[in-house]
């Protein structure tokens, strides 16, 4: 039986502690849109998206009004476009036309973002994969809502270093051609190892080929709720700390489960998963870094940070998994620098470095996220950073990713203003020693010995 205390507690979570449902993401399979004629492919894609997603935004608003729970984003993810466009696209320009079709469809149905301008190349690249990757700078320039991702490695297949090298060059080019835009194209691109098929979060969402024709995935967010709960147990031992995080994560996830089931019923689309991630925003009091400080650190990045984050990540999963029938996606604690005021403060104070962030990614989802680096950083250095992060994912059998923002014309200490949920990022120093010879070897890094389970 629900008591009045629980009602008041949930109300406070929403009104005072920034509890929200970060996204309802409708995954749509485009495999039945494949055709050898490019015009037909574009027509099929537009028609399918605008038909299946026509009520997504209105349904989200209706659920918001009914339950007074903010739903920040309504999004779409689609089948990786390298698979869909492979038969019709003979050039990078052909793929850009599909990106523009996705953008047009997203605007027609009113969603915030559409993800899936993607390629899966963990063991090798087809011609279509390569063309799509090379088209990303132009696609990011000519679209507003399209998000892109490439999976370059997995525990089972190793790391495709040819793709890693190409993506380093592509990120540099994307930063250059989109430098005049309000949001850098690099903020809408993620490179993955062990990318999940059911991720509702951008920019890395795509609708995996293992999925149904359409599916509803929901991402919840509640760093402020967790921090407020921990304020009440200051000085208590780790057992009390962990129990508090678990109970809070259960409540937050239960809200997501409610929204997901309602959206599924109203749209007539099966419920997929709840992503258990704690996703911060630039708002004061909505920070993962602040939770780490509440656990006992002076600043995120201090000794003990990796242990505190590991504890947080694990307890969020333990609590959240009991609150939903299906969990998946990335599920953990995001540590994006630009989207978390506590992280920004830690960087500005000299407490948090790129190398410490890399260590933190060993124990949480998802990786080096929304990190501004000097605009003159070499493409091979970017590839080296990506390779390091992919290796962490490959060896530890977890999802890792990089979303790096080369800030053209800016150097260490400058600030990149991105705006909205993406916030702003101080430009962080990058190790200047060369990895050119390593990146230029070519080929792939083999899968680790413990990947052989058969």
UniProtKB/Swiss-Prot annotation:
Pfam families cross-referenced by the UniProt entry: DUF711
Superkingdom of origin organism: Bacteria
Gene3D superfamilies named among the record's database cross-references: 3.20.70.20
Subunit comment: Homodimer.
Family the UniProt entry places it in: Belongs to the UPF0210 family.
Stated name of the protein: UPF0210 protein EUBREC_1565
Species this protein is from: Agathobacter rectalis (strain ATCC 33656 / DSM 3377 / JCM 17463 / KCTC 5835 / VPI 0990) (Eubacterium rectale)
């Amino acid at each position: 039986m629900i008591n009045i205390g629980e009602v008041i507690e949930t109300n406070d979570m929403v009104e005072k502690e920034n509890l929200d449902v970060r996204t309802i993401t409708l995954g749509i399979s485009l495999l039945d849109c494949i055709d050898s004629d490019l015009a037909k492919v574009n027509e099929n894609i537009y028609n399918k998206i605008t038909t299946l997603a026509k009520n997504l935004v209105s349904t989200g608003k209706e659920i918001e009004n009914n339950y007074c729970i903010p739903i920040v984003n309504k999004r779409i993810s689609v089948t990786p476009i390298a698979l869909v466009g492979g038969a019709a696209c003979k050039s990078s320009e052909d793929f850009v036309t599909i990106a523009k079709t996705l953008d047009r469809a997203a605007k027609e149905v009113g969603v915030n973002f559409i993800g899936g301008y993607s390629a899966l190349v963990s063991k090798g690249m087809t011609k279509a994969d390569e063309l799509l990757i090379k088209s990303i700078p132009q696609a990011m320039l000519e679209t507003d809502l399209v998000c892109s991702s490439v999976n370059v490695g997995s525990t089972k297949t190793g790391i495709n270093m040819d793709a890693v090298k190409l993506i380093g060059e592509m990120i540099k080019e994307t930063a250059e051609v989109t430098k005049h835009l309000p949001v850098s194209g690099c903020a809408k691109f993620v490179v993955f190892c062990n990318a999940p098929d059911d991720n509702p979060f951008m920019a890395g969402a795509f609708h995996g080929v293992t999925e149904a024709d359409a599916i509803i995935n929901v991402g919840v967010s509640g760093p402020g709720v967790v921090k407020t709960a921990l304020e009440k147990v200051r000085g208590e031992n780790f057992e009390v700390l962990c129990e508090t995080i678990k109970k809070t994560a259960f409540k937050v996830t239960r809200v997501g489960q409610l929204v997901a089931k309602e959206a599924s019923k109203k749209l007539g689309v099966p419920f997929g998963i709840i992503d258990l991630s704690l996703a911060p925003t630039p708002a004061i009091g909505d920070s993962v870094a602040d939770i780490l400080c509440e656990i006992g650190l002076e600043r995120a990045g201090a000794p003990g940070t990796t242990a505190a984050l590991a504890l947080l990540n694990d307890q969020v999963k333990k609590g959240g998994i009991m609150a939903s029938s299906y969990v998946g996606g990335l599920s953990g604690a995001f540590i994006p620098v630009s989207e978390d005021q506590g992280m920004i403060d830690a960087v500005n104070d000299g407490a948090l470095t790129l190398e410490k962030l890399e260590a933190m990614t060993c124990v949480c989802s998802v990786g080096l996220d929304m990190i501004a680096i000097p605009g003159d950083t070499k493409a091979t250095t970017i590839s080296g950073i990506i390779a390091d992060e992919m290796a962490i994912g490959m060896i530890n059998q977890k999802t890792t990713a990089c979303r790096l923002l080369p800030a053209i014309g800016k150097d260490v200490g400058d600030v990149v203003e991105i705006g909205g949920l993406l916030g702003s990022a101080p430009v962080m120093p990058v190790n200047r020693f060369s990895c050119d010879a390593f990146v230029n070897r070519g080929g792939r890094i083999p899968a680790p010995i413990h990947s052989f389970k058969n």
